[in-house]
Amino acid sequence: MTEARHQVNFITGNANKLSEVKAILEPAISVTNQSLDLVEIQGTLEEVTIDKCRRAAELVGGPVLVEDTCLCFDALQDLPGPYIKWFLGSIGHEGLNNMLLAYEDKGAKAVCTFGYSAGPGHEPILFQGITHGKIVPARGPSNFGWDPIFEYEGKTYAEMDKAEKNKISHRSRALAKLQEWFAKEMTA
């Protein structure tokens, strides 16, 4: 078994996100977890992630990894964007589809931004991954956010098994950049 060279404290209360992050990063990077109730500012995805990362590092008093995800509809100039969690909670999968009824363009992008901070006072470093797809009526299990309505190459995220999704998702693309950064830090 490969021993982890790095450890990150992933700040999330979302068990599905934690499971995906562990599946992608381990064993190369050991993932511990802490759930903190962090206030989220309004702003761009990058601003939200940087602020969340700084707050988490201060609360924990050490290194942290945070994540923010958005779903951007091409026809709506990237809305709902970083507010997807609130849109989904208010109007559900059907409501999100209804937002695009007047538009031919159902294109969307899933964007995941991780922020890593070495601790309080350290500037967060961002790692972003994007997957382009489209919005479709819900298909597959509905136990993980908007996965049933985001289609990539003929399958919704919800229709994919975990290994398949973890190869192509916005989250896996962002984490690949994090892994690359950690590898460079080891040789620096």
Swiss-Prot record:
<dbReference type="GO" id="GO:0035870">
    <property type="term" value="F:dITP diphosphatase activity"/>
</dbReference>
<keyword id="KW-0464">Manganese</keyword>
<feature type="binding site">
    <location>
        <begin position="144"/>
        <end position="147"/>
    </location>
    <ligand>
        <name>ITP</name>
    </ligand>
</feature>
<dbReference type="GO" id="GO:0009204">
    <property type="term" value="P:deoxyribonucleoside triphosphate catabolic process"/>
</dbReference>
<keyword id="KW-0539">Nucleus</keyword>
<feature type="binding site">
    <location>
        <position position="85"/>
    </location>
    <ligand>
        <name>ITP</name>
    </ligand>
</feature>
<dbReference type="GO" id="GO:0036220">
    <property type="term" value="F:ITP diphosphatase activity"/>
</dbReference>
<feature type="binding site">
    <location>
        <position position="52"/>
    </location>
    <ligand>
        <name>ITP</name>
    </ligand>
</feature>
<dbReference type="GO" id="GO:0009117">
    <property type="term" value="P:nucleotide metabolic process"/>
</dbReference>
<dbReference type="InterPro" id="IPR027502">
    <property type="entry name" value="ITPase"/>
</dbReference>
<feature type="binding site">
    <location>
        <begin position="170"/>
        <end position="171"/>
    </location>
    <ligand>
        <name>ITP</name>
    </ligand>
</feature>
<dbReference type="GO" id="GO:0005634">
    <property type="term" value="C:nucleus"/>
</dbReference>
<dbReference type="InterPro" id="IPR002637">
    <property type="entry name" value="RdgB/HAM1"/>
</dbReference>
<keyword id="KW-0547">Nucleotide-binding</keyword>
<dbReference type="Pfam" id="PF01725">
    <property type="entry name" value="Ham1p_like"/>
</dbReference>
<keyword id="KW-0479">Metal-binding</keyword>
<dbReference type="InterPro" id="IPR029001">
    <property type="entry name" value="ITPase-like_fam"/>
</dbReference>
<feature type="binding site">
    <location>
        <position position="165"/>
    </location>
    <ligand>
        <name>ITP</name>
    </ligand>
</feature>
<dbReference type="GO" id="GO:0036222">
    <property type="term" value="F:XTP diphosphatase activity"/>
</dbReference>
<keyword id="KW-0378">Hydrolase</keyword>
<keyword id="KW-0546">Nucleotide metabolism</keyword>
<keyword id="KW-0460">Magnesium</keyword>
<comment type="function">
    <text>Pyrophosphatase that hydrolyzes non-canonical purine nucleotides such as inosine triphosphate (ITP), deoxyinosine triphosphate (dITP) or xanthosine 5'-triphosphate (XTP) to their respective monophosphate derivatives. The enzyme does not distinguish between the deoxy- and ribose forms. Probably excludes non-canonical purines from RNA and DNA precursor pools, thus preventing their incorporation into RNA and DNA and avoiding chromosomal lesions.</text>
</comment>
<comment type="similarity">
    <text>Belongs to the HAM1 NTPase family.</text>
</comment>
<feature type="binding site">
    <location>
        <begin position="68"/>
        <end position="69"/>
    </location>
    <ligand>
        <name>ITP</name>
    </ligand>
</feature>
<dbReference type="GO" id="GO:0046872">
    <property type="term" value="F:metal ion binding"/>
</dbReference>
<feature type="binding site">
    <location>
        <begin position="12"/>
        <end position="17"/>
    </location>
    <ligand>
        <name>ITP</name>
    </ligand>
</feature>
<feature type="binding site">
    <location>
        <position position="40"/>
    </location>
    <ligand>
        <name>Mg(2+)</name>
    </ligand>
</feature>
<dbReference type="GO" id="GO:0005737">
    <property type="term" value="C:cytoplasm"/>
</dbReference>
<comment type="subunit">
    <text>Homodimer.</text>
</comment>
<keyword id="KW-0963">Cytoplasm</keyword>
<protein>
    <recommendedName>
        <fullName>Inosine triphosphate pyrophosphatase</fullName>
        <ecNumber>3.6.1.66</ecNumber>
    </recommendedName>
</protein>
<dbReference type="GO" id="GO:0000166">
    <property type="term" value="F:nucleotide binding"/>
</dbReference>
